[in-house]
Curated annotation (Swiss-Prot):
PANTHER family: FLAGELLAR L-RING PROTEIN. The keyword Lipoprotein applies. Assembles around the rod to form the L-ring and probably protects the motor/basal body from shearing forces during rotation. This is Flagellar L-ring protein. It is found in: Cell outer membrane; Bacterial flagellum basal body. It comes from Pseudomonas fluorescens (strain Pf0-1).
Length: 231
């Protein structure tokens, strides 16, 4: 019996541990800054004043378009979602069967115990009703800026960017991460682009420390809020 209780307790602890969100850690290699690729040195051509690999476009600007370039993304995220649902189902049914005769005789007989006569009449009635109402609302706002690096340039000119920002405060750390795809045409002349123009964006805002821990329910509360709770 004690062994069974120990197994059940251990299973509960393991299940609750699976409900805990992983704590973000710094220095994730995926979000590490990407350094520009060093061009291979070309053979010097002493017979010409123009050397390959050192040319510059007279009509180009300083907008980021190469691996390792820096882009500042302004965070302008705002989402509002709401949903209402209600349902009501009702059903009434009634059935009655009246027998006046049975095998040629009367279907009603005297009650030997007294009272009303006994009858073979059958009656049934039933009512069923179901009613449900649900409402959900959620809103999020994220503003600010984060500077990231160009991680790759796709063959069609789309720029893949990603990066992170860690801010160490007195009570913990704050983290902002972003990764996505940007069109070169959407980048302003000061190398800024709005987060609303980032395709396939992956934006993370999280933190560690006492403030972040205070917003999380305890392990005992998480059990009652988990799908394992039967009620």
């Amino acid at each position: 019996m004690k062994r069974f209780v120990s197994v059940v307790a251990l299973s509960g602890v393991v299940s609750l541990a699976g409900c805990v969100a992983p704590t973000p850690k710094p220095n994730d290699p995926y979000y590490a800054p990407v350094l520009p690729r060093t061009p291979l040195p070309s053979a010097a051509n002493n017979g010409s004043i123009y050397q390959a690999g050192f040319e510059q476009n007279l009509y180009s600007d300083r907008k980021a378009f190469r691996v390792g370039d820096i882009i500042t993304i302004t965070l302008n995220e705002r989402t509002q979602a709401s949903k209402n649902a209600n349902s009501q189902v009702a059903k009434n049914s009634k059935t009655g069967i009246g027998l006046t005769s049975l095998f040629g005789g009367s279907a009603t007989t005297n009650n030997p115990l007294g009272g009303n006569d006994l009858s073979l009449d059958v009656g049934y009635s039933g009512d069923r009703a179901t009613k449900g109402d649900s409402k959900a609302a959620q809103g999020n706002t994220l503003t600010g800026s984060i500077t990231v690096t160009v991680a790759d340039v796709l063959p069609n000119g789309i720029i893949a960017v990603r990066g992170e920002k860690w801010m160490t405060l007195n009570t913990g750390d704050e983290l902002v991460r972003i990764a996505g795809l940007v069109r070169a045409d959407d980048i302003a002349t000061d190398n800024t682009v709005s987060s609303t123009r980032v395709a396939d964006a992956r934006i993370t805002y999280s933190g560690t420390g006492s403030f972040a821990d205070a917003s999380q329910p305890g392990w005992f509360d998480r059990f009652f809020l988990s799908p394992l709770f039967p009620f």
